[in-house]
Regions:
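Conserved CoA-thioester-binding segment of acyl-CoA-metabolizing enzymes
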Residues: 1-52, 88
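Hydrophobic/aromatic residues within transmembrane alpha-helices
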Residues: 15, 51, 64, 112-114
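A short, glycine- and basic residue-enriched loop/turn
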Residues: 20-23, 56-57, 62, 68, ...
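Hydrophobic alpha-helical membrane-association signature
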Residues: 30-33, 79-82, 112
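Glycine- (often His-adjacent) and acidic-residue-rich active-site loop
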Residues: 53-89, 105, 135
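CoA-thioester-processing core
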Residues: 86, 90-92, 100, 106-145
């Protein structure tokens, strides 16, 4: 099952992170699906990309803490590297990438929105890096964007 859906409408690729029950939280599978979705975009047929989250509660509520809690040190390092690589790919994508932020954009979700060129926000958009309050450095390049 893919956690990222792609729709092409009038030369606009709409990528939707589709885990609304988990508030679209990021885990290795979501990041791999997001990477694959960007790599599959036909840059000759598409003029821009809109990235959003399914449901109305959350763009991306951050990393999937449940998934992270079972990772070994090596798996955690690989997860951080994958997230950083995917976000750098989005940041340097040759087409404009627009984050359509609906609800929470926390932690990795805020970092994901920051990796996009433009952020369009609903009235209920909330941004933050709550991990810094726990003494944890943002893992996907959020201190550099």
């Amino acid at each position: 099952m893919s956690f990222v859906t792609t729709e092409i409408q009038d030369a606009v690729a709409v990528l939707t992170i589709d885990r609304p029950k988990a508030l679209n939280a990021l885990n290795p599978e979501v990041l791999a699906d997001l990477k694959a979705a960007f790599e599959a975009i036909d840059q000759n047929a598409v003029r821009c990309v809109v990235l959003t989250g399914a449901g109305d509660k959350s763009f991306v509520a951050g990393a999937d803490i449940g998934s992270m809690s079972t990772m070994t040190k090596a798996e955690g390092e690989a997860f951080g590297k994958l997230g950083n690589d995917v976000f750098l790919m989005i940041e340097s994508f040759p087409l404009p990438v627009i984050a359509a932020v609906n609800g929470f954009a926390l932690g990795g979700g805020n970092e994901l929105a920051m990796s996009c060129d433009i952020r369009l926000c609903s009235d209920n958009a909330v941004f933050g890096q709550p991990e810094v309050g726990l003494g944890i450095t943002p893992g996907f390049g959020g201190t550099q964007r």
